[in-house]
A protein has these predicted regions:
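Rossmann-like NAD(P)-binding element
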Residues: 5, 14-92, 102-118
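Small-residue-rich helix-loop
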Residues: 193, 316-343
C-alpha cells in the first residue's frame, strides 16, 4: 500500500465506478481468495519485478491445485519463464500476459497478449477475450501467444515499436516546426489529414489533438511541455534482447537513445547555444516538403515494424515458441497504443 494514496482505494472504487454493479471489493487477501470459485483465476496488475514475486508468495499458501495466476504487468520475459516453472512446480498454472491500452484500455478494452501455461488458456480465454478490445472486424484483440514468457516478450517488442513510432512522429514535428516554420494549428491540420489515410493510427490522431490543445491561459500546451522523455525499461529490453539474438533493431535502438539524450536537458541547452540551427535558404514549396515528410515517416514506420517482427521470429525460432506473427499483428489492431490501419 502506498501511504496517503492507496488507503481506502477499494471503498472509493465500490462507491464510485463500481456502484450498482456486480463487483465485490476486499481488503483482506485470504477473504479475496476464498471468495473465488475453483479453479481460481487471479489477475495481478502490479509493478514489474519484486512486487510480483512478493504477491505470488502471499498467494501460494492460499491457492488450490490447478488455480491460475495471471501477471498483466510489464514483466521481463525471463522473470516470467521462471515464474511459470515455479508455479507449475507447486501445482498451479501461470500466465504472463502483455496488456496494452493504458487507462482507456482498462475502460474500453485492451490488447491482451497471454502466454505461459497452455493448460490455463481454455479457462482464461473467455474472461480475457471478453475484456479485450475488438478489431474493426469484431475479432477480440486477444489470442494465445505461446509458452513460457512469450506473451511478455511480444509485449516488450510492442513497446519497442511504440518507442519507434513516437520518435518518428517527434522528428516529423520537429522538421515541420523548425524547418518549415509551421504553426501548431498548421501542423495539427497536417497530422489530422495524415490520419485520414494510410498513416491513420491512435498516435497520429492524438498528436493532432495535442497540437491543438490549449491550457487555461489560452496558450498552446505543447509549447510548455518539457522536452525530456522518461522510460520504464521495455524499450531498452527490446534492444538488449535483439542484440543477444543477433538481430538488427536500429530504428528502435535510436529511439531509446533519443529518450536518454532528451533527459540530459542541461547538456542539450548548452549545446544549443554553441550550435545554432539556421535556415540557409527560404523554403518556397512547403506543401511538397510536407508530402516528403509523410513518405519518410511511412517508410521509416515500415522499417521499424519489419525489424520488430524479425526479432519476434528469431526469438520464436531460438526458444521454440512457434509464434504466429499474423495473429500477433491482428491482436495489435485495436486497444493498444500502436493500433493503426497499417496493421
Amino acid at each position: 500500500t502506498v501511504p496517503g494514496v492507496e488507503e481506502g482505494v477499494v471503498e472509493r472504487f465500490l462507491n464510485g465506478r463500481a456502484k450498482g454493479k456486480n463487483i465485490e471489493g476486499f481488503t483482506d487477501i485470504k477473504a479475496f481468495v476464498d471468495s473465488i470459485a475453483i479453479p481460481r483465476k487471479i489477475m495481478m496488475m502490479v509493478r514489474a519485478g519484486s512486487p510480483v514475486d512478493e504477491l505470488m508468495d502471499q498467494l501460494f499458501p492460499l491457492l488450490s491445485p490447478g488455480d491460475i495466476l495471471i501477471d498483466g504487468g510489464n514483466s521481463n520475459y525471463e522473470d516470467t519463464n521462471r515464474r511459470v516453472q515455479l508455479a507449475e512446480s507447486k501445482g498451479f498454472l501461470f500466465v504472463g500476459s502483455g496488456v496494452s491500452g493504458g487507462e482507456e484500455g482498462a475502460l474500453n478494452g485492451a490488447s491482451i497478449m497471454p502466454g505461459g501455461s497452455e493448460k490455463a488458456w481454455p479457462e482464461v480465454k473467455p474472461i480475457l477475450q471478453s475484456i479485450a478490445a475488438k478489431a474493426p472486424d469484431g475479432t477480440p484483440c486477444c489470442q494465445w501467444v505461446g509458452p513460457a514468457g512469450s506473451g511478455h516478450f511480444v509485449k516488450m517488442i510492442h513497446n519497442g515499436i511504440e518507442y519507434g513510432d513516437m520518435q518518428l512522429i517527434a522528428e516529423a514535428y520537429w522538421v515541420m516546426k523548425k524547418l518549415l516554420d509551421l504553426t501548431n494549428e498548421e501542423m495539427a491540420d497536417v497530422f489530422a489529414r495524415w490520419n485520414e489515410g494510410k498513416l491513420r493510427s491512435y498516435l497520429i490522431e492524438i498528436t493532432a489533438n495535442i497540437l491543438r490543445h490549449k491550457d487555461k491561459s489560452g496558450g498552446y500546451l505543447i509549447d510548455k511541455i518539457l522536452d525530456a522523455a522518461g522510460q520504464k525499461g521495455t524499450g531498452k529490453w527490446s534492444v538488449i534482447n535483439a542484440m543477444e539474438l543477433g538481430m538488427p533493431l536500429g530504428l528502435i535502438a535510436t529511439a531509446v537513445f533519443e529518450r536518454s539524450l532528451s533527459s540530459q536537458k542541461d547538456l542539450r541547452h548548452l549545446a544549443s547555444k554553441q550550435f545554432q540551427c539556421q535556415h540557409t535558404q527560404p523554403i518556397y514549396n512547403k506543401a511538397e516538403l510536407v508530402k516528403n515528410i509523410f513518405s519518410a515517416l511511412y517508410a521509416s514506420k515500415l522499417v521499424s515494424y519489419a525489424q520488430g517482427f524479425a526479432v519476434l521470429q528469431r526469438a520464436s525460432d531460438a526458444f521454440g515458441w512457434h509464434l504466429d506473427l499474423a495473429s500477433i499483428a491482428r491482436m495489435w489492431r485495436g486497444g493498444c497504443i500502436i493500433r493503426s490501419i497499417f496493421l
